[in-house]
């Protein structure tokens, strides 16, 4: 048996699988977000641990026998979150999350004054990354910054609670911007730019390697053996790729979760920071990936639900009553700023071209189309950087919305395949990493999923949405020149 634990933004998910990768059971526990000011997004690290404990307790109710047979555990999690620990290894403050944009000024300083972030770190400095968050803390909370003993990422804080060891994997560590991506190790130069040293960083392992062993106390609580191995694990996007068998050059995925991700595997470090692409280590040895990210994918739908008081099913029903090829209002999905390709923390969400006859269904269609335009913008960046995938899988909750996938496939002019089993995700990828950490070979573990359906580009949709996308881009450029 193998356990995968994913520390998401909206909740923690734990999955239990057998040696044949059949899902035995899963459990989830929701998480809240603290938003005290515009642009702020925080969570207490203790919330993650409490949620993990709740998912394990839920699994214990009906599957204690299977839990007792777990050989290894894999971890995945939301990337970039800053968890600052004091001399007693207690959090100094709530974790500053990936979608927190307060450090836009600090990101600009690092990006303009330290070109090594783009060359060694492989990425333009954006507010979502960990490095500018630490610099913000140094400037605005110096009394806390000076007490930092260790900085961990969200899933690595959970590893610390499980094992007592401070360790990260290379895929997640890539998102700090303190990693020498090509050489797969911490960079003294990049850390020094933020007033930090390698002594304040966790040890590093490959995602598929063993990192530590479950502590005796936690093993006893969870009814497990004392020799359960903890895999290095992965950031959420790399873990999702592992779960989908996206492990070799030419493999790609589009993830429609809270954020939207376009992911393409490479066999070498291929930075393209100037064009807005991210270059990270993958969760497997000698493997890298390029990635484009938009900050509000399904989160845009969540916002519309909150704003209208309607459920996603109700909004979809109203949308289905509209003409699917009629030009919808245009929506900019920049509710938390934007990463790829704009790198603009000040970008804002907006509707354009709203007419008297438009209603909630039209707004829902506009949101789906606007997020699709954002995904296409990120995809185009990867293509221009040489990372065009030869086949694409869809993952995340939004992948179940065929209309949405149809829009994306038609706009990027590429087929998109949807896995048959929608429970595949970061937690399953974490469980696969656990299997490899216990000694199983990559080719045996990282198989491709069974495909339920492949959505091919629809020429009518392409014809209808191409001019709308161009208009959306023109609107952004015009507004950015005036307001951003």
Residue ranges with predicted function:
Residues 25-29, 202, 352, 453:
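Structural signal for short hydrophobic segments within the conserved structured cores
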Residues 3-4, 109-129, 135-167, 177-188, ...:
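Active-site core segments that coordinate phosphate-bearing ligands/cofactors
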Residues 64-67, 76, 145, 198, ...:
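Alpha-helix termination/capping residues and helix-transition junctions
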Residues 194-206:
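A conserved helix-loop-beta module that forms one wall/lid of the active-site cleft
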Residues 1-93, 119, 147, 219-220, ...:
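N-terminal glycine/serine-rich phosphate-binding loop of ATP-dependent small-molecule kinases
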Residues 14-16, 21, 73, 100, ...:
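Conserved small-residue
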Residues 29-30, 98, 173, 295:
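A generic structural motif
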Residues 61-98, 123-128, 159-180, 203-206, ...:
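Short beta-strand-loop/turn "lid" adjacent to the catalytic site in phosphate-handling enzymes
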